[in-house]
Amino acid sequence: MKLVSIALMLLGSLAVLGADTARLDTSSQFRKKWNKWALSRGKRELQASSSYPTGLVDEKTVPTQTLGLQDKQSTSSTPQASTQSTAHIRVKRYRQSMNQGSRSTGCRFGTCTMQKLAHQIYQFTDKDKDGMAPRNKISPQGYGRRRRRSLPEVLRARTVESSQEQTHSAPASPAHQDISRVSRL
C-alpha cells in the first residue's frame, strides 16, 4: 500500500514538473522568435531610412522603383534579390500604414462593445417606426381624429343636424346632456 502511494506521489510530481518545464520552453521559444523578428525589422527600417535620408518618399520615384524591382525579380533567378525586394516592399507598406494613423475609433473594452451592441439593436428595432399612421388608415375611412377631420363638410352638417334633432325630440337627463356636449368637442 505504501509503495502505491509513493508511486502516485512520484508520478504526480513528475507530471507537474514536466508541465512547468514545457511552459518555460514554449515561452523561451516565443521570446527567441520575437527577438529575431524585432532585430530583422530594425535592420530593414535602418536600411530604408538610409536610402531615404529625409524619411519621405518622392511620389515620382515610387513607381520607377517598384518597376525596377519587378524587372530585377523577373530577370534574376537568385533568391537573394527576391528577398531584398520583398523586404523593401514591406518597409513601404509599413511606412504607409504608419502615416495613416489609427484606423479604428472608440474603445475596445467590454462595456463599449455592449453599448455599441445595444445601440445597434435600438437602431434595428426603431428604424421602421414612423410618427405617421399607415396610408390606408389616413383615408376618410380610417380611425381616430384623422377620420373626423377628413370627413366632408356635408357629412358633418348632417351629423350635427341629426344630433340636434335627437336632443329636441326627447328631453334627456342632465347626465346625457353633459355627455353629448363632451362628444361634440
From Swiss-Prot:
GO biological process: adenylate cyclase-activating G protein-coupled receptor signaling pathway; adrenomedullin receptor signaling pathway; androgen metabolic process; animal organ regeneration; branching involved in labyrinthine layer morphogenesis; cell population proliferation; cellular response to xenobiotic stimulus; developmental growth
Residues the UniProt record annotates as site (Required for CALCRL receptor interaction): T113, Y122
Subcellular location: Secreted
Keyword tags: Amidation, Cleavage on pair of basic residues, Disulfide bond, Hormone, Secreted, Signal
Compositional bias (Polar residues): 160-170
Disulfides per UniProt: C107-C112
GO molecular function list: adrenomedullin receptor binding; hormone activity
Tissues in which the protein is found: Expressed in adrenal glands, lung, kidney, heart, spleen, duodenum and submandibular glands.
Cellular component annotations (GO), alphabetically ordered: cytoplasm; extracellular space
Keyword Secreted listed: yes
Modified residues annotated as Tyrosine amide in this record: Y143
Secretion signal span: 1-21
Region (Disordered): 68-89, 125-185
Residues modified to Arginine amide: R41
Propeptide segments, given as residue ranges: 45-91, 150-185
Chain intervals with Low complexity compositional bias: 73-87
Pfam families tied to this protein: Calc_CGRP_IAPP
Matches recorded under InterPro entries: Adrenomedullin-reg_peptide, Calcitonin/adrenomedullin, Pro-ADM
Family to which the UniProt record says this protein belongs: Belongs to the adrenomedullin family.
Functional summary from the UniProt entry: Numerous actions have been reported most related to the physiologic control of fluid and electrolyte homeostasis.
Name the record gives this protein: Pro-adrenomedullin
Organism: Rattus norvegicus (Rat)
